[in-house]
Amino acid sequence: MVLSANDKTNVKNVFTKIGGHAEEYGAETLERMFTTYPPTKTYFPHFDLHHGSAQIKAHGKKVVGALIEAVNHIDDIAGALSKLSDLHAQKLRVDPVNFKLLGQCFLVVVAIHHPSVLTPEVHASLDKFLCAVGNVLTAKYR
């Protein structure tokens, strides 16, 4: 998925609003994913999955931190997320469809917290970006 210059600008603008809320938005994204798609919980048998859980907050912060890293290296997402791709493909063996589900939940969280920012054009750019991240994270499964 190729991001245009306009897509990159849109994504960077959205993430200027998200950066300071990594833990909050990440936890909310994970909680939405676990509630909406219960099979995704199977990858977290050791987590307390209740609302407000310290483990959910910490992992949510890591998830959004990885997205921020991808934004900071938007011209080389594969390089920026290479180690994370290895981890998910070789050690954790996460079903690749879960990255799409997580991306959908993240879009909902952005829409809830920043409705005026998520215009149709920005929504499309952010979706393309999240698909690009998902593609990078699943590339080493092949």
Swiss-Prot record:
The keyword Iron applies. GO terms for cellular component: blood microparticle; haptoglobin-hemoglobin complex; hemoglobin complex. The keyword Cell inner membrane does not apply. Disulfide bonds: none annotated. O2 binds at H59. One of its GO terms (biological process) is hydrogen peroxide catabolic process. Involved in oxygen transport from the lung to the various peripheral tissues. This is Hemoglobin subunit alpha-A. The gene is HBAA.
